[in-house]
From Swiss-Prot:
This is Regulator of G-protein signaling loco. It is found in: Cytoplasm; Cell membrane; Apical cell membrane. One of its GO terms (molecular function) is GDP-dissociation inhibitor activity. Residues 247-423 form the PID domain. The keyword Nucleus does not apply. Expressed in surface and longitudinal glial cells, gut and heart (at protein level).
Length: 1541
């Protein structure tokens, strides 16, 4: 009999069909989804064999069904053959591209590759097959097996019996990614083939009523006898397995746990080493902090324990698959591979055939790689002594290396331990150890017990979530492959081992072996940590009374199976809402427990006579509320919002929040009590806490809705954020409860203790503030529950044992934590808070002759809390004289700056005058003295005394008065943890679901208090009043601009104690921090650095995050004004700033003006361009916007983002003129310019001459006005080919205000800068050196555009001509300042000649109709305004007239549009000689000047050799080519001029 087990295709594109021996393939294969496995129908042979599909099989020897082998020939296409292969030995076709040669040849996803071109590849590695196919050209001939079978093996023979007794049923594989709703819908609605059972096999009778669902097989292939309840069968099978607890040998080592990564289903033995090392490499790249655990290696199992003795994970020896270190060079890391059995059949609806009571299931084995690291810092005995005490280890010396065996120095020792312990005997398959469990549990299945459903929360492979990180247990994104069972390691302190053992003792006879899963991951077989805790009331109702003599364990729970009738709505859940249904043969407590990634747990109260309960840890105290009824466990709000919709008036409380509410139980089916766990990270209570809480665990709790979907309606989230980013990309920020329960709670005068635990899966700086809603009656409950002031335990941030962590939680310094030396190692601040610790530490300092430090620090603490100013003055002088003065009696070691700062402020007696010195001393003690103290014999003696319950050497009762401080909340919050050496001494965020929860260099307590004061000035909260929701709203409402909640504030976790009080708190720490909100809503706390600009700070942040923002603005939160990026970053200290993306593009105006435009990305193009056109007096109707490069018109209704980084041009639709580089308008569209009447010109010229004589004396007399008005405006900010005539006009109009802005001529200046230069910018070069000859500064060509519009405004033209003549007079005067006019200027005929020349030039510049002009014979020292293209070669001062294509690339791009004719030749005789270094001006910004000194060609050796100090004269080339193309009319005054900015 052949049994066919084709593996499930990974990404099949078409449905594949199982082939049975002698039977036709089934015709109704379920259609496959586009991206998922193709469901495979089952066909039954006439002989009655059923085809079970197995996703993965152990492969032994290749054996093929030769009826299913075919030979195909595939030709290589343009893009290859069109198929992908996966796996190896043999490889499998995993994806067939549609319309590819592979599809045309008939290849199907799931087929196995047997041979290629006659070469058998069934046993070759994957890489070899890939190379063989990839190197083939033309066509390849392949042998394809439609099914792949293993040879008969022991494993298969053992399963044969079971197969013969299981009837065939129409079963389908469940989809691997249930969150594809369309695919799920198709799958659920696809037709199913009903098969009649073969007559040869007698139906197995069900022991349950027909109403109860039947059971699918659980294990891979355990043998099943007809009588399932025989104790002898159980004993026989269990005898094959080693009994748990029979180990006599045990090895224990301390290791660090990094994380778990799911491994491929099909992993061959040869690739295990490579796979393990890749897992190690991935986790190392994520730079995770290890969790220190105790690995106990026994012959039966390998377990991981926490420092409190709680079992974190247990793996039976049968499940340990492989162990290896990372490499020989880096031997600190090692990986442990475990296997787990699971059933791939999710609760699909099905109809039992007549007489059939069981259906074939789909069994598969998955592997998990757990990565560990050896802490080499703990090798020395003195270094790990404290850690050994935490784990209650007695160190065992190695006589050879003289090192402790419990703290190995490399991973090879642990690897060899594991190998030697488990490889000396032949281990059975992973499923073999569970046959007894199955035989015992099958009866329960036949009795109709509901099956426990559990799936591991895998990190999602969704494109918006997945990054380059591994798929290890990151605690985010539960929506992916349900079939992967991950052996997650849960770092939680459970109840003491005694209670757990007592609870487990009732799970079944001691002969029962451990199940395949880790014992519920916590040592109890019947519990599974599921993704969403959701009990099913139908499970309780279906549960029959106990009928079996055996108290059997709920095996199905540990095997993670799902089964429910077709009518159960829960079968349509997404993967992250899988239910956990616990039912046994008697009504049991519902013990639905969420997965460790979920953090919100829902468990039954512990009872030692029940086997289905977790031991209840200590939990956060809650107010009793008897008025509420427990909701029915199957209320839809506990399920996915995708299926049931968002519940009304409820907010999504995902795995970051717990709303713990206690109520009485009123449900008819709920006869057991329920309770709610606190967050898994926060169950760090001492044993006495757990005991006291267990006693009161009969109180009833109601778990708030735990929808896994992101709360997209939350106002705190940006509307444009991706749902995945908003839900999981950053730490979710949920809103507090707003349902009736919360309202009623407020009416009762209580506030729900909502814990918001941000999952720190983003970068270390991505931190969110937790909203802490605190109990108003906290003080009364403090002594009862022995909890901290704010009942929020710290996330595991210290390496201390749970007792120390418990102590570290008590922010107010409760009495039970005093005199506890083990807590001192966890925190320097905690030790100072403890009177015994203070006294012990001071005695230690006295032995080191540095006790003055602690005395100074405590004196400063007392001083800071003084109310009276007079007392402060006296106390300040006393402290200064004793510790800081030059002749002080007990001087402390502070730097001179802190000492001088204190001395300067001594008279003021401000509360914080000693803050700098105190901070230095505190850091000195914390990072120097305290470190030695922890390793000192004095501290060890204190710890030993504590462990032996002996009195401490220094009890603190007789503490020196000078060492006493007021450790109330306000004082304690200021115990600095600045610049903590967290990397060496703390484990900050060891598992990914509580990633780093403290700001790197600031204590969370300090930050929250300071942020309260710095960012949200508000009415003071009473000193000792808890921060209730009402007061929190009051605080937040005071300053909405800095609302910590609306802005999704980014401090990850705070000790709640700082929320109240905080009086006298110095804001020094927070003032070196600022919060930066990025465009995607992510927030970060960034430290400002002295000497760093705002721009550098933002660039540093963006670079760290690997973000590229080409253009952005930085604005204060709530403001619209952008911050200058050149300002020092200190202006951001204590502030909240937002980085806003901007769109930037360049805009060419019709006249040669280039504007750089920066806009918000949400605007449309016309909204951006219209104000610009209005500013420059253009109308939208008269212009058209085109792309400068392609000349394609642009639709202005498009978003402005389409122009990002582009170059746009504005062209006149019907213009009289078109000037500018790159003009696309033909010359014929430019009309000839009407020359001005002769009378106007004469009048203007005479007026100019009269006025400039009067202004000359003023200009010379005023030393200030000359550099501003007369000196060259050519500076580093302006290009040389621009005229300053109208810049001066604008300046005068700005100063005098006599010329309206609307009347300024449309003479747009060209600018090649990347950004629009300020028109009012003044020169720096000329002003800085007013003694240079004015002629040198002013000698330059002036471009004057004479248009009809200019002629209309004669006042402006007059002003321009007047300044031109002024410059002309300066030019004629030579390098020496001489106020006598030259004789030739006194000749009136010269002026008439100038006017005549002007007329001639204007006529000659008209390209259409030229007005003839008579040349004059008079000498021409006056302004020569004629230049045409034909005159260019005459110039003796010709400037390197190279074609524009010869320009350097960088220069050409920016100057090609601004080219113009070259300057005029120099004037004869009186012209000052230009020196060789003429025009040495350093361009700034993006301006590139064509005429650099290297390109300057001296006109003559004489001119080149003349000395001079001229710095800002650059000849102009104003767009020769473009001028001709546009037919533009320009007149060039060959006078000195200034360029605009």
């Amino acid at each position: 009999m052949h049994h066919h087990h084709p593996p499930l295709p990974i990404t099949g594109a078409s449905g594949s069909t199982a082939v049975g021996t002698g039977a036709a393939a089934a015709e109704d294969a379920s259609p496959a989804a586009n991206s998922g496995p193709a469901p495979i129908s089952t066909s039954t042979t006439p002989s009655g064999s059923n085809s079970q599909q197995h996703q993965r099989r152990r492969k032994k020897r290749a054996n093929y069904n030769y009826n299913g082998i075919r030979t195909v020939e595939v030709r290589r296409g343009y893009n290859g053959f069109g198929f992908t292969i996966s796996g190896q030995q043999p490889c499998r076709l995993s994806c067939i591209i549609s319309s590819s040669p592979a599809e045309q040849a008939g290849l199907r996803s799931g087929d196995f590759l047997i041979s290629v071109n006659g070469l058998n590849v069934s046993k070759l590695p994957h890489e070899t097959v890939v190379q063989l196919i990839g190197n083939s050209f033309g066509s390849i001939r392949m042998q394809i097996a439609e099914n792949y079978y293993s040879d008969s093996s022991d494993e298969e023979n053992a399963h044969a019996t079971l197969r013969g007794q299981l009837l065939a049923a129409s079963l389908r594989h469940k989809p691997r990614f249930l969150h594809h709703k369309a695919k799920l819908h198709r799958l659920r609605n696809s037709p199913q083939k009903k098969l009649n059972p073969p007559e040869a096999v007698e139906p197995h009778k069900s022991k349950s009523s027909p109403d109860h669902p039947t059971l699918k097989p659980v294990l891979e292939d355990p043998p099943l006898t007809a009588n399932l309840s025989k104790a002898a069968d159980v004993a026989n099978v269990s005898a094959m397995v080693r009994a748990v607890g029979s180990a006599a040998l045990e090895c224990r080592v301390i290791v660090g746990y990094l994380g778990t990564i799911e491994m491929p289903k099909q992993i061959s033995h040869s690739s295990k080493l490579q796979t393990v090392r890749s897992c190690i490499r991935k986790l190392r790249q994520e730079k995770r902090q290890p969790t220190i655990v105790l690995m106990c290696i026994t012959p039966d199992s390998l377990s991981l324990q926490s420092s409190s003795g709680g079992v974190l994970a247990t793996y039976s020896s049968a499940r340990l698959n492989f162990v290896s270190s990372s490499s020989e060079s880096e031997n600190r890391f090692f990986g442990l591979v475990t296997s787990a059995v699971h059933n791939t059949q999710i609760e699909e609806e099905y109809e039992p055939s007549a007489g059939s009571a069981a259906a074939a299931g789909h069994i598969s084995i998955s592997h998990s790689c757990h990565v560990f690291v050896i802490d080499t810092k703990l090798i020395e005995h003195a270094q790990h002594l404290q850690r050994a005490h935490e784990f209650r280890l007695q160190c065992t010396r190695d006589p050879i290396s003289n090192l402790c065996l419990e703290f190995p120095n490399n991973s090879e020792y642990v690897v060899n331990l594991v190998r030697s312990m488990y490889t000396m005997r032949i281990l059975p398959p992973a499923s073999r150890s569970h046959q007894a469990d199955y035989e015992a549990g099958a009866g329960a299945a036949a009795a109709g017990g509901a099956v426990a459903a559990a799936h591991s929360p895998q990190p999602s492979n969704h494109s918006e979530i997945s990054t380059t990180t591994s798929n290890s247990d990151s605690g985010i994104g539960f929506n992916n492959d349900c079939t992967n069972i991950s052996d997650r390691i849960l770092v939680v302190d459970f109840l003491a081992a005694g209670a757990g053992a007592a609870a487990a003792a009732h799970a079944g006879p001691p002969t029962y072996p451990a199940p395949a899963r880790p014992l519920g991951i916590v040592g109890i077989p019947d519990n599974r940590l599921t993704v969403r805790a959701m009990p099913d009331h139908s499970a309780l109702l279906r549960s029959p009374p106990a009928s079996s003599s055996l108290r059997r364990p709920n095996l199905l729970a540990s095997f993670n199976l799902i089964q429910s009738p077709a009518t159960n709505l829960t079968s349509t859940r997404s993967c992250d809402d899988v239910l956990n249904l616990f039912v046994d043969d008697s009504p049991r407590t519902l013990a639905a427990v969420a997965s460790m990634d979920d953090i919100s747990l829902h468990s039954a109260a512990p009872s030692l006579d029940e086997g289905h309960t977790f031991a209840h840890p200590a939990c956060v105290p809650r107010k009793m509320r008897r008025s509420l009824a427990l909701e029915t466990p199957t209320t839809p709000h506990k399920l996915s919002a995708q299926v049931f919709g968002q519940p009304g008036s409820r907010h999504s409380l995902g795995f970051e929040a717990i709303d713990s509410v206690q109520s009485s139980v009123s449900g008819a089916c709920m006869d057991q009590t329920m309770d709610t766990w606190a967050s898994l990270q926060n169950l760090h209570k001492s044993h006495k806490d757990r005991t006291s809480m267990s006693a009161s665990s009969s109180s009833h709790c109601l778990l708030e809705a735990t929808n896994s979907e992101p709360d997209l309606g939350n106002r705190a989230l940006p509307a444009n954020a991706s749902p995945f980013r908003r839900a999981w990309g950053q730490s979710s920020f949920r809103t507090p409860r707003s349902d009736k329960v919360a309202k009623e709670q407020q009416q009762l005068g209580q506030s729900s203790p909502v814990r918001r635990t941000a999952s720190m899966n983003a970068s270390d700086n991505d931190m969110y503030i937790k909203t802490l809603m605190l109990d108003s009656d906290l003080k009364s409950s403090r002594s009862q529950h022995q909890l901290s002031l704010l009942q929020v335990p710290k996330v595991l941030t210290t390496p201390a044992p749970p007792s120390a962590i418990t102590a570290s939680v008590a922010a107010e310094g409760a009495a039970q934590d005093h005199g506890c030396p083990s807590s001192w190692a966890g925190s320097f601040e905690r030790m100072l808070q403890d009177a015994a610790g203070m006294q012990t530490f001071s005695e230690f300092l006295k032995k080191e002759f540095s006790a003055e430090n602690i005395y100074f620090w405590t004196a400063c603490e007392r001083y800071r809390l003084l109310e009276s100013e007079a007392d402060r003055v006296a106390q300040a002088r006393e402290i200064f004289a004793k510790h800081l003065a030059n002749n002080s009696s007990d001087p402390v070691n502070v730097d001179s700056q802190a000492r001088s700062l204190t001395e300067e402020k001594l008279a003021d007696a401000a509360p914080d005058i000693f803050a700098p010195a105190q901070k230095q001393i505190f850091s000195l003690m914390k990072f120097d003295s305290y470190q030695r103290f922890i390793r000192s014999d004095l501290y060890k003696s204190c710890v030993e005394a504590e462990q032996k319950n002996q009195p401490l050497p220094y009890s603190g009762l007789d503490l020196d008065e000078l060492l006493k401080t007021n450790f109330h909340l306000g004082a304690f919050s200021k115990l600095k943890k600045s610049a903590s050496n967290a990397e060496d001494r703390r484990r900050k965020s060891l598992l990914p679901w509580h990633r780093k929860t403290r700001s790197k260099s600031r204590d969370r307590t300090e930050i929250m208090a300071d942020m309260q004061h710095a960012l949200m000035p508000a009415p003071p909260v009473p000193q000792n009043a808890p921060l209730t929701s009402a007061s929190l709203k009051l605080v937040c409402g005071q300053n909405s601009l800095s609302d910590l909640h609306s802005s999704r504030s980014s401090l990850s976790s705070f000790d709640a104690g700082t929320a109240t009080g905080g009086q006298g708190a110095s804001t020094e720490s927070v003032y070196s921090l600022c919060r930066v909100i990025l465009t995607d809503g992510a927030t970060t706390i960034v430290q400002t650095r002295p000497g760093e600009t705002v721009g550098e700070l933002v660039e540093r942040l963006l670079e760290k995050r690997n973000l590229v923002y080409p253009y952005y603005d930085i604005v204060f939160q709530g403001s619209t004004k952008s911050i200058d990026v050149q300002q020092p970053s200190q202006i951001l200290a204590g502030k909240e700033v937002v980085i806003e993306r901007r769109v930037a593009f360049k805009l060419d105006l019709p006249d040669p003006k280039v504007i750089s435009v920066k806009s918000k990305p949400k605007k449309q193009l016309h909204e951006v361009i219209r104000p610009i056109l209005s500013k420059y007096n253009y109308k939208m109707e008269q212009v058209q916007v085109i792309m400068r490069d392609t000349q394609v018109p642009i639709d202005l209704n498009q978003p402005v983002t389409m122009a990002d980084g582009q170059r746009l041009r504005i062209v006149m639709v019907n213009s009289d003129f078109q000037v500018g580089g790159g003009s696309s308008m033909p010359p014929k569209q430019s009309k000839p310019m009407k020359p001005l009447p002769q009378g106007h010109l004469d009048e203007l010229t005479n007026k100019v001459f009269n006025e400039l004589l009067a202004s000359k004396a003023d200009a010379a007399a005023s030393e200030k006005s000359r550099p501003v008005d007369l000196c060259s405006m050519k500076s580093n900010e302006a290009p040389s080919e621009t005229s300053s005539l109208f810049e001066r006009m604008r300046r005068q109009q700005r100063d005098g205000g006599n010329i309206p802005a609307s009347k300024l001529p449309k003479l747009k200046k060209k600018s090649t800068s990347s950004s629009q230069q300020s028109e009012e910018a003044a020169t720096t070069q000329a002003v800085a050196d007013p003694k240079k000859p004015i002629i040198a500064k002013l000698k330059a060509g002036v471009k004057l555009q004479v248009t009809e519009r200019v002629a209309e405004h004669q006042d402006e033209l007059l002003e321009g001509l007047k300044r031109a003549q002024l410059a002309r007079l300066e030019d004629q005067r030579g390098t020496e300042i001489n106020f006598d006019l030259p004789d030739f200027l006194k000749n009136k005929e010269n002026l008439s000649a100038a006017v005549s020349k002007l007329r001639k030039v204007r006529a000659s510049l008209s390209p259409v109709s030229k007005v003839p002009a008579t040349p004059t014979e008079i000498p021409q020292p006056a302004p020569r305004l004629s230049i045409t293209r034909s005159q260019q070669p005459v110039s003796p001062m010709k400037v390197d007239q190279e074609p524009e294509t010869d320009l350097p690339a960088a220069t050409q791009d920016q100057t090609e549009f601004a080219k113009a004719p070259p300057p005029l030749p120099p004037k004869p005789k009186v012209l000052p000689i230009k020196p060789s270094n003429w025009g040495v001006a350093q361009p700034t910004g993006n301006y590139c000047n064509k005429y650099s000194p290297s390109k300057q060609v001296p006109t003559s050796p004489k001119e080149a050799s003349k000395p001079g100090t001229f710095a800002s004269k650059i000849p102009l080339d104003l767009g020769r080519k473009s001028l001709e193309e546009a037919g533009s009319r320009c007149a060039y005054l060959d006078e000195p001029s200034s360029s605009f900015v």
